[in-house]
């Protein structure tokens, strides 16, 4: 690692990348990020010069509106199971016929 990348480091640590491209996050990093195994997610940003910024994906980065909507749907399904119906795939295909959609594209804030 270049010396200038460590100039502001409080602690440095390393981990090895496995043949499958995986690594174990060292304990000091997990502790600093307050990561809970099996619960938390990590956000990565690739910076100029090949450096990567990594942080815990926290509540402040969650979509509170979407979460509220999903809680509403969950409660509605729980309280009114008689109103749930199977999805008709043919009707769904008709709804999107002629649309050019790439499900891998990110949805921007203006959409």
UniProtKB/Swiss-Prot annotation:
Residues 12-59 form the SpoVT-AbrB domain. Disruption phenotype: Not essential. GO terms for cellular component: cytoplasm; toxin-antitoxin complex. Its main location: cytoplasm. Pfam families: PrlF_antitoxin (PF15937). It is found in: Cytoplasm. Keywords: Cytoplasm, DNA-binding, Repressor, Toxin-antitoxin system, Transcription, Transcription regulation. Antitoxin component of a type II toxin-antitoxin (TA) system. Labile antitoxin that binds to the YhaV toxin and neutralizes its ribonuclease activity. Also acts as a transcription factor. The YhaV/PrlF complex binds the prlF-yhaV operon, probably negatively regulating its expression. Negatively regulates its own expression as well as relieving the export block imposed by high-level synthesis of the LamB-LacZ hybrid protein. Overexpression leads to increased doubling time and also suppresses a htrA (degP) null phenotype. Homodimer; forms a complex with YhaV with stoichiometry PrlF(2)-YhaV(4), possibly as a YhaV(2)-PrlF(2)-YhaV(2) complex like the MazFE complex. This complex is seen to dimerize in solution. This is Antitoxin PrlF. It comes from Escherichia coli (strain K12).
């Amino acid at each position: 690692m270049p010396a200038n990348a460590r100039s502001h480091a409080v602690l440095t640590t390393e981990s090895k990348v496995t043949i499958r491209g995986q690594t174990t996050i060292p304990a000091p990093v997990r502790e600093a990020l307050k990561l809970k195994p099996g619960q938390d997610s990590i956000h990565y940003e690739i910076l100029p010069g090949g450096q990567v910024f990594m942080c815990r994906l926290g509540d402040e980065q969650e979509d509170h509106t979407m979460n509220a909507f999903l809680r509403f749907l969950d409660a509605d399904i729980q309280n009114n199971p008689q109103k749930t119906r199977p999805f008709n795939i043919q009707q769904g295909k008709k709804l999107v016929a002629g649309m050019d959609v790439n499900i891998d594209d990110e949805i921007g804030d203006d959409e």
